[in-house]
Amino acid sequence: MKRNKHHGLNVEFDGLCMDFGHVSLNKKKEFLCGDCYKIEENDEDHVLVLSDGLGSGVKANILSTLTATMLSTMIINQVELDEAVRAVAKTLPVCSVRNLAYATFTVLNFQGKQVSLYQFDNPDAIPVSYTHLTLPTNS
């Protein structure tokens, strides 16, 4: 696994290569961003978590950081995903109006050579295989 200066990540095994990157933008006039991206790793396993704290500012930042940190730490330490999610769900406040947890997340879990993707209220991930990707041509 290699990290680059642009907050990216490159994972290679058995001839496969996966690249990840992220960019977070603060809302206008906000000092803190409501998105949090955490990477935890050991000798064989890698966990990437993206969390989005609903709303903006300090509250969104704290909740997304708490969510990403809890999930990445528990999963890299072999806690089952459903148990980790329950622990996070018990910790996060719930919006009384929308009845939603105040943070969403996506987890990408590399265990040895197996990769799992878990999503909770985030937009669907878009897997791209460049061997099967047809790019539009300019005409």
What are these regions (language model features)?
Residues 1-31:
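Regulatory cytosolic signal-relay segments
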Residues 2-11, 33, 63-129:
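Catalytic core of PPM/PP2C metal-dependent serine/threonine phosphatase domains
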Residues 2-11, 41-48, 59:
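Membrane-embedded alpha-helical signal segments
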Residues 16, 43, 112-114:
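Beta-strand-turn-beta hairpins that frame and shape the catalytic cleft
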Residues 30-41, 133:
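Acidic loop->beta-strand submotif enriched in PP2C/PPM serine/threonine phosphatases
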Residues 32, 50-51, 59-62:
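Short, glycine/acidic-enriched capping/hinge loops at junctions between secondary-structure elements
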Residues 44-56, 117-120:
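Conserved beta-strand-loop-short alpha-helix elements that form
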Residues 132-139:
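Single conserved hydrophobic/aromatic residue that forms the stacking wall/gate
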